[in-house]
Design a protein with these regions (language model features):
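Transmembrane-helix motifs of polytopic, lipid-linked glycan transferases
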Residues: 30-56, 94
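Transmembrane-embedded, aromatic-rich helix segments that form part
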Residues: 106-116, 120-134, 141-148
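Transmembrane helix irregularities
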Residues: 25-26, 38, 54, 70-74, ...
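Alpha-helical transmembrane segments of multi-pass integral membrane proteins
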Residues: 7-8, 19-20, 32-39, 64, ...
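Membrane-helix interface segments
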Residues: 28-31, 54-62, 101-107, 137-141
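Short hydrophobic/aromatic helix or loop-helix immediately within or flanking a transmembrane segment
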Residues: 3-28, 189, 193
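Specific aromatic-rich, kink-prone transmembrane helix
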Residues: 46-50, 66-78, 86-111, 129
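Membrane-lumen/periplasm interface segments of specific transmembrane helices
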Residues: 138-195
Length: 195
C-alpha cells in the first residue's frame, strides 16, 4: 500500500460520509482529528444513560465516565491517527443503551450504523444479536440482527474482494488451520481448539 488508493479499496467504511459535510466546510486533516475526538468523547452520553438505566449512583457513573475518558485505547489514538475503529465504541454503547431500555427501533438504527463502520464491524452486531436472542429472549429480533449482520459481513467481504485489494484475513492466520477453507476454517478452529 505504498501509493495512492481509495480507502474503500481496503475497508468498507461508509460511516465516514457522516463527516463529509464538516470536511467540505473545513477541508483540513485537523478537521478530521477534531471530529474523531468529538465522536469518541460523545460515547460519554450513552455510557451515562446506561449507568442511569442500570441504577448506578452518581459516584459510580463518574467513575465509569473517568475510566472511559482516560482509557488510552479510546482517546490516545485521537492525537495522531484517524481511523474508522474510533466510531465503534460510541455506536456499540448506543446500541446497548437502546437495547437495555427497550427502544428496539433505535437499537436497529444504531446496529445498521454499526455495520457501516468497517467490513468486520458486523461481528459486533452479530454478538448483539446473540445477546438479544440468548439473554434477552428477544428471539425474532435477535435472529434478525444476527442473520442480517452475517449477511452484511459476507456482502462487505465480497465487495472488498471484488472491487478492492481483497479482505485482509491474514490477521486471522493463527486461527486458520486449513488454508483451503479460508475464514470458514477459523470457525472450525474456535470450536475444535478454542485455546
Amino acid at each position: 500500500r505504498d501509493g495512492l488508493l481509495s480507502h474503500f479499496a481496503v475497508h468498507l467504511s461508509p460511516v465516514f460520509y457522516v463527516l463529509l459535510p464538516f470536511y467540505k466546510l473545513f477541508p483540513r486533516p485537523e478537521t478530521l482529528l477534531v471530529l474523531q475526538s468529538l465522536v469518541v468523547i460523545s460515547g460519554m452520553v450513552p455510557l451515562c444513560l446506561l449507568t442511569r438505566a442500570f441504577g448506578f449512583t452518581r459516584p459510580q457513573t463518574l467513575c465509569y465516565g473517568l475510566m472511559y475518558c482516560f482509557y488510552p485505547a479510546f482517546m490516545g489514538g485521537c492525537f495522531y491517527d484517524f481511523h474508522e475503529n474510533k466510531f465503534l465504541a460510541v455506536i456499540i454503547l448506543w446500541c446497548m443503551y437502546f437495547l437495555e431500555t427497550g427502544h428496539f427501533k433505535s437499537m436497529l438504527a444504531s446496529a445498521a450504523l454499526l455495520l457501516m463502520v468497517k467490513e468486520d464491524a458486523p461481528v459486533y452486531a452479530a454478538c448483539i444479536g446473540l445477546y438479544l436472542f440468548l439473554w434477552k429472549k428477544q428471539y425474532r429480533l435477535g435472529a434478525v440482527v444476527f442473520l442480517a449482520s452475517c449477511a452484511y459481513f459476507c456482502i462487505a467481504i465480497w465487495y472488498i474482494n471484488r472491487f478492492g485489494e481483497g479482505a485482509m484475513i491474514n490477521r486471522f492466520d493463527n486461527f486458520i488451520s486449513d488454508k483451503r477453507l479460508g475464514l470458514v476454517s477459523m470457525f472450525k478452529t474456535i470450536l475444535v481448539n478454542p485455546a
